[in-house]
Amino acid sequence: MSKFKEGNLEAPTRHPLNWKDKDFYDEDALNNELERVFDICHGCRRCVSLCKSFPTLFDLIDESETFEVDGVDKADYKKVVDQCYLCDLCYMSKCPYVPPHDWNVDFPHLMLRAKAIQFKKGETKLSHKVLTSPQKVGAIASKPIISPVVNWSNKNKTLRKVTQKVLGVHENAVVPTYHSKGLSKVFVEESIESQFKVAIFGTCYGEYNDPKTVIDLVDVLRHNNVEVRLIKKTQCCGMPKMELGDLDSVVKYANENIEPLMELVNDGYKLIAPIPSCVLMFKNELPMILHENINIKAISDAFFDPFEYLSLLIENNHFDDKFKAIDKEILYQVACHQRVQNIGAHTKKILGLIPDLDVNIAERCSGHDGTYGVRKETHTYSVKIGMPVAKKITDNTDLVVSDCVMAGNHVAHIASQEIDSIHPISLVKLAYDL
């Protein structure tokens, strides 16, 4: 008899991703595991509202001859896999059968395994490979001669139709702006003597698309007498490639990042990234993939979400809470990849310290989810997923705020009214009157 009760009251644990195991890429073994897990999901259906994967699975079952998983053609399993964008919410917030439960369900990592097999078989579209290469694309698109053309073409309806055909970017999807003066060019070194030392992993998005938000983070940290450095010569965190199933690239990027990050960790620096997905990658995912690497564990322990670090300053009486009033009403969308870090509601807590700021919270997925929200095959679904958040915007809402700027931009874009979106750290900077 199982020692675990229905619903699993034990604290969830997670097993390492055994991607080097010979059975990991065995398609028959994969299909057997998919059938087992799909049957468990079929009997539960608690996750039906999270994303498109689960409705796709349940529709396949309900429309089969047997009304069971055994009636679903295994060739159709791919339809379920393709709708998963590895948000991790099912594992962290819904599933009652995650380890240590006997049934050992890890739906996201099972989907990752399926994606990895698809990638190994050469079934991944070239356009998807391009879209999951933000560092390479950003390095080209942000060149001084090229960035004005790229930004102009992204606002041209006719050219967006061409981009949809060639690159698979949906013509109505919000796409980022590229800056020729990226983060590494606008960051200014400043010497501060402090026991609190932070090194910022700028991220691909911060370097090429949104350097302002990262500089806002730098300004807030320095205002609180924190020594801040920008980490030079880093690779992409690997999250986009992981969502593609390209584990070889994930490991390659990680190995290239380990040395510069470990140098800083050994020098006593904490690490921060402005994008929740990048933080999640270093905190949670890479330790599961490179579980034998002790340096990855040390890097994971040193990595902080920006507001998690500000909370650390509060605990150490090293945080300035003398904010000016901001008379605005905001919709704060809690980013999925921040939620699943299980670090607590630090952003909400600190925004609550700002006088007169009215914070309305939407703890639901934005639907953006990396490339899912921009691809022509899935953009329509992303709008549907994010619409419950967008509907929370009222005539009184002044701003959409999200720790994931891309998620916030997506919500603002699909809303029925024009509204701006910013990172919450920019609100904190405003409240400091910097």
PLM regions and their residue ranges:
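Polybasic, low-complexity association/targeting segments
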Residues: 1-2, 154
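Non-heme iron-sulfur electron-transfer modules
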Residues: 2, 6-24, 49-85, 97-128, ...
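Short N-terminal secondary-structure initiator segments
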Residues: 2-8, 28-40, 47, 172-187
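A short alpha-helix capping/helix-coil boundary motif
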Residues: 15-18, 27, 60-61, 71, ...
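Asp/Glu-centered strand-loop micro-motifs enriched in Gly/Pro and often flanked by an aromatic residue
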Residues: 18-42, 72-73
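Short, glycine/acidic-rich beta->alpha junctions
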Residues: 29-33, 76, 252-253, 385
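Cysteine-centered iron-sulfur cluster-binding motifs in ferredoxin-type domains/subunits
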Residues: 33-54, 76-102, 114, 137-141, ...
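Iron-sulfur cluster-binding electron-transfer modules in prokaryotic oxidoreductases
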Residues: 105-434
